[in-house]
Amino acid sequence: MKTYSAKPAEISKKWILIDATNLVLGRLAAKVAVVLRGKDKPTYTPHMDCGNNVIIINAEHVKLTGDKSNAKSGKFYYRHSGFPGGIKVTTAGKILQSNYPERIIQLAVKRMLPSNKLGRKQFSNLYVYKGQTHPHAAQTPVLYDFAGKNSKNIRNQNIV
């Protein structure tokens, strides 16, 4: 038996819709990274972009476990301007409260993909939106029930 290697004509991409309301960020990002790479398919080929397209809605309602959204002891995100002393620090809580809460999901997924040309191509198949609406209705995305797969995937408001 020979090892299967997918050809570009054999790759079929589907559109998957995930509602991020009350979902745990790390678990969501890990699953989305697997779907974007195509590792959930039996026809996975490491050097081809055989993953699906993923649409995530309600990005502002994603949850962080533990004390990660705390300003003093939480999760920090760093960026550098390139100038001496130009390091900028922000917290996960500030990103979620900002005008662009979808960036926290994008950062989490991007850091779980390979950092090469193929990883950048696979990351371009991710679409994250704040709110319920998205412009991809023509692609007829299939709703993926990520919350129902495991009870740890969801974090309710009243659980601390």
Swiss-Prot record:
GO terms for molecular function: mRNA binding; structural constituent of ribosome. One of its GO terms (biological process) is translation. SUPFAM superfamilies: Ribosomal protein L13. It comes from the Bacteria. Pfam families: Ribosomal_L13 (PF00572). One of its GO terms (cellular component) is cytosolic large ribosomal subunit. InterPro entries: Ribosomal_uL13, Ribosomal_uL13_bac-type, Ribosomal_uL13_CS, Ribosomal_uL13_sf. Gene3D superfamilies: Ribosomal protein L13. Keywords: Ribonucleoprotein, Ribosomal protein. The keyword Transferase does not apply. The keyword Ribonucleoprotein applies. Part of the 50S ribosomal subunit. Belongs to the universal ribosomal protein uL13 family. This protein is one of the early assembly proteins of the 50S ribosomal subunit, although it is not seen to bind rRNA by itself. It is important during the early stages of 50S assembly. This is Large ribosomal subunit protein uL13. The gene is rplM.
